[in-house]
């Protein structure tokens, strides 16, 4: 949580850094309310985009990935759909360069719009420093899902994406990094395309 105060204003770009580097849930809600008119309006757009890019087993209720349920189901996805979303973000999106710039930034500092409060974000994606060719990724955690990660690597013309769900619960937050490294190494060694 970024710890925004009521009526505070921010630039969208700064909120995107807070969301993607710190996983600040309040930044996700603020973006959703401004871009979609409401959380519900934004998640409707998220669900439409997910279907458009081929995600058939994903249903978003929250803009931040937190556990939720409504009359239509539970907030859920699959490892395959998360990989498909990351593929879109790094290979197909018209904003792919912006996405990569944000998700690869080691840290980011910004002020609120009125310049009365400064905020600091730190990239928690340890995979970026683990392997040559590590491109990007996003961490996540909920009580139901455990630690999750989706990451990409580019090496010798190959782009590999690893998606991990339920990869440990506290005190095992580091499992995802070793599992990602092993899967990426396996893919580089054994996968041809």
Locate predicted features:
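Active-site-adjacent loops and short helices of periplasmic peptidoglycan-processing enzymes
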Residues: 1-80, 90-92
């Amino acid at each position: 949580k970024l710890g925004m105060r009521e009526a505070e204003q921010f630039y969208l770009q700064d909120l995107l850094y807070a969301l993607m580097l710190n996983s600040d849930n309040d930044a996700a809600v603020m973006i959703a309310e401004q871009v979609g008119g409401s959380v519900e309006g934004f998640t409707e757009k998220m669900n439409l985009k997910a279907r458009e890019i081929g995600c058939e087993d994903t249903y978003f209720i929250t803009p931040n990935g937190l556990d939720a349920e409504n009359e239509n189901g539970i907030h859920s996805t699959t490892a395959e759909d998360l990989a498909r979303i990351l593929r879109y973000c790094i290979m197909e999106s018209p904003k792919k360069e912006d996405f990569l710039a944000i998700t690869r930034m080691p840290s980011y500092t910004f002020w609120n719009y009125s310049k009365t409060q400064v905020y600091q974000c730190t990239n928690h994606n340890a995979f970026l420093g683990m392997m040559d060719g590590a491109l990007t990724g996003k961490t996540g955690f909920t009580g139901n899902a455990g630690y999750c990660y989706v990451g990409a690597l580019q090496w010798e013309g190959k782009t590999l994406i690893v998606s991990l769900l339920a990869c440990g619960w506290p005190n095992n937050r580091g499992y995802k990094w070793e599992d990602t490294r092993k899967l990426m190494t396996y893919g580089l060694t054994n996968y041809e395309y």
